[in-house]
From Swiss-Prot:
Pathway the protein contributes to: Carbohydrate biosynthesis; gluconeogenesis; Carbohydrate degradation; glycolysis; D-glyceraldehyde 3-phosphate from glycerone phosphate: step 1/1
UniProt catalytic activity: D-glyceraldehyde 3-phosphate = dihydroxyacetone phosphate
Gene symbol of the encoding locus: tpiA
Any Pfam family: TIM
Family under the similarity heading: Belongs to the triosephosphate isomerase family.
EC numbers: 5.3.1.1
Name this polypeptide is given: Triosephosphate isomerase
Positions with a binding annotation for substrate: N9, W10, K11, G172, S212, G233, G234
Subcellular location: Cytoplasm
Length: 248
């Protein structure tokens, strides 16, 4: 049985004080959640948020990291730095990183491997553009991403990866894939994982939906057989909204 996982990606929002205020509001609202709850603040807020959620059921993730151990990479954060802070998760290959920062599948693959080397669980993002959806190449596009991003992992590692299916056309646009569309694509992703690592691994991998997830859409999505959670953007910035999603 897969434990559902709902993660809030705060993107480039909130100072340290604002971030701590948000988790303090969130804590009592999600304490009885039946799913795993993760918040992903900016790098500067990670330490304060990690301390604020100590002893609760809320886990903490980073939004990105470099794949190298250390070195002359101005502005970057190494996996071992996140490990030293006891961070639980790291988002890898978000469409905004791929689009604005030229992140490639090769880079994502290195980051996924680096995450495992440092006791971090990757939340690996994949998804198609509106043009790709309309011309019927969704599965081809995602298969190319998944195959490249997970290449070289052991079965033990592969089953721990959290995959977030985020149709790029539904991020921050207010457009949402229908729950049937999302479930269909997520089932296809599970089949891709099975092809690479076997059905047993595929049955353990948790696959989230991410793309304008809202309190009023989550229940229908979570009722689908292959959807194991959500990667939430805007709605995770308000404690009451995120709690409503978590307590679907």
């Amino acid at each position: 049985m897969r434990t559902p996982i709902i993660a809030g990606n705060w993107k480039m929002h909130y100072t340290i004080d604002e971030a701590v205020k948000l988790v303090e509001e969130l804590k009592p609202l999600v304490k009885d959640a039946k799913c795993e709850v993760v918040v992903c603040p900016t790098f500067v807020c990670l330490d304060a948020v990690k301390k604020a959620v100590e002893g609760t059921n809320i886990k903490v993730g980073a939004q990105n990291m470099h794949f190298e151990e250390k070195g002359a990479f101005t502005g970057e954060i190494a996996p071992r730095m996140l490990e030293a802070m006891n961070i639980d998760y790291v988002i890898i290959g978000h469409s905004e990183r791929r689009e604005y920062f030229n992140e490639t599948d090769e880079t994502c693959n290195k980051k996924v491997k680096a995450a495992f080397a440092h006791n971090l669980t990757p939340i690996l993002c994949c998804g198609e553009t509106l043009e790709q959806r309309e011309n019927g190449t969704t599965n081809d596009v995602i298969k190319a991403q998944i195959t490249a991003d997970l290449e070289g992992l052991t079965k033990e590692q592969a089953e721990k990866v959290v995959i977030a299916y985020e149709p790029i056309w539904a991020i921050g646009t207010g457009k949402t894939a229908t729950s049937d569309q999302a479930n269909e694509t997520i089932a296809a992703i599970r089949a891709m994982v099975a092809e690479m690592f076997g059905q047993e691994v595929a049955d353990k991998v948790r696959i989230q939906y991410g793309g304008s997830v809202k309190p009023n859409t989550i229940a229908e999505q979570m009722a689908k057989s292959d959807i194991d959670g959500a990667l939430v953007g805007g709605a995770s910035l308000v404690a009451a909204d995120f709690a409503q999603i978590v307590n679907y």
